[in-house]
Amino acid sequence: MADTSQRLAIVGPGLIGTSIGMAAKRRWPHLEIVTIDAGQPLSLIGHALVVVLAAPVDAILSILPELPAVIPDTALVIDTGSTKQAIISAAAQTRIKHFVGGHPMAGGTSIADARADLFDGRPWFLINRSEPDALKRAAKFVEALGATPVIFEDGGEEHDRLMAAISHLPQITSSMLMAVVARAAGPDNLHFAGNGLRDTTRLAASPASVWHGILASNREHVAPLLKFLANELHALADRLDDPVAIAAVFDEANRSRAALGGEKEPATFLRNS
C-alpha cells in the first residue's frame, strides 16, 4: 500500500477504526483514507484497496451482504469483530472474493483512547479460510499497523471459545458485579468504595450497544461459562467459614493472576504467521 493513489476504507470509525486510520497514516502518510459511519452510504468505499469493517458485530453482519455491489473485485475485506464464526459464515454467503476475518487484541474505554500505536506489539487474530493470498495480504497489513498476526486454522470456533473465556466472561461478570454491588450498597453509598471496586468493575463502563451482538453471536461458548461461574460461586457461598476452601480459591487465583502478568504470547494451539 505504498502507492499514494491507493485508498483505505474504514467502515465504523470508533476506537478501533479510528486507531487503524491513525496507524495507517503513520505507516503511509500520503495514503487516502475514507471513513464511513453508520447511516452513510457504503458507496463511499469507492476504489479502496483494503476495506476494514470496524463496526460492532451485529452491524458487520448487516453490512456484509451489501459489500459486493460497492467494492472492487480485488479489494481485501478485513473485519475486526470480537467473534468470528458468525461473521465468517455470513461472509461465505456473499460474493466477496477476498475476505479475512480478524480481531485485534487491543482497545480502550472510548474513542478518546484512539491512537496510532494502539496495536503495537499486540496480537491480531486472523482466520485462515483456505485463501492464502488474502491471508498473506491481511497479515502484511496488520503487521504494517504494528500488530503481530496470529493465525487460527479452524474457521473461528477456537477463537470464539478462547474469547468467551478471556474477554466475554470477564465483561459480563464485571457488569453483573457492578449491578449487584449497586443494589446491595445503594447508589448513594458507592462513593465510599475504594480502588478495588473501581479496578474490578472497569469493564462495567462498556456500552450494551457493542456487547449485545458479541454475546448473542457467541452464546454457545459464553453461556456454559456463566453457568460454571454461577455454580462455583454457589458452592463457595456455602463454605465461607471453611479456611481450606477459601485458601484453595485464593491460591488458584493468585497463581493464575501471576501467570497473566504482562505475557502476550499466543496460546500453544495458535500459530504465528
Where on the chain are the PLM-derived regions?
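Rossmann-fold dinucleotide-binding core
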Residues: 91-152, 160-163
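Phosphate-coordination loops involved in phosphoryl transfer and adenosine-cofactor binding
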Residues: 4-7, 74, 121
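Anionic-ligand binding region
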Residues: 135-201
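Rossmann-like NAD(P)(H) cofactor-binding subdomain of soluble oxidoreductases
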Residues: 63-113
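NAD(P)+-binding Rossmann beta1-loop-alpha1 motif at the extreme N-terminus of oxidoreductases
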Residues: 1-46, 50
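Rossmann-like NAD(P)-binding element
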Residues: 43-72, 76
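Interdomain hinge/lid region at the active-site interface
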Residues: 188-257
